[in-house]
Amino acid sequence: MKESLVNKLNKLKKSFLIKENLSKSFNLIYLKISEIIFLKKVLLGKPLIIGLAGGQGSGKTTFAHFLKLILENKYNLKTAAISIDDIYKTKKERFRISKKINKLFITRGVPGTHDVKFLNIFFKILKNNKFNKSYLIPKFDKSIDDRLPKSKWHHLQKKVDIFIL
């Protein structure tokens, strides 16, 4: 038997160690935003890129995971979600830039430390619906302050309807 959306959401809630009752905010925020995204996708008929903004620790990753779960299970939309942290340049690249421009570039988070070129190429592929092969997206590990090996990157094997960043 297929697991219910409510059960999946409760499991996800536990995985993020959320103790608060989400019923009120869930109905007002998560479901409504998911519905708006679904309707926008239907109207446009092409993949959507959803960007989440907020300070460190504000809940962007948690929000993205809840949206992904709802969009996939309630609306049957193929959804991918990654963190903006995953797009940081490698430690080696940041070190090289820090030697040329400014020592602050060694620290992730400084403007210019994200791989914007990669994102632009990926978004063009997604926008033009030319997603005809599997695609690797970097995965960053803050504990080592660097990208993980390619074997551990996000592996998108399908066209996506919604991409959350």
Stretches found by the model and what they are:
Residues M1-I29:
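Charged, amphipathic alpha-helical linker segments immediately N-terminal to NTP-binding catalytic cores
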Residues L17-N21, A80, I87-I144:
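Conserved nucleotide-sensing/catalytic segment adjacent to the nucleotide-binding pocket
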Residues L31-L43:
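Pre-Walker A adenine-sensing motif
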Residues I49-G54:
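Short hydrophobic/aromatic beta-strand immediately N-terminal to the Walker A/P-loop
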Residues G57:
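Walker A (P-loop) phosphate-binding loop of P-loop NTPases
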Residues K60:
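Conserved lysine of the Walker
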Residues F63, L67:
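Hydrophobic positions on the alpha1 helix immediately C-terminal to the Walker A/P-loop
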Residues L69-A80:
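Post-Walker A helix-loop "phosphate-sensing" segment adjacent to the P-loop in P-loop NTPases
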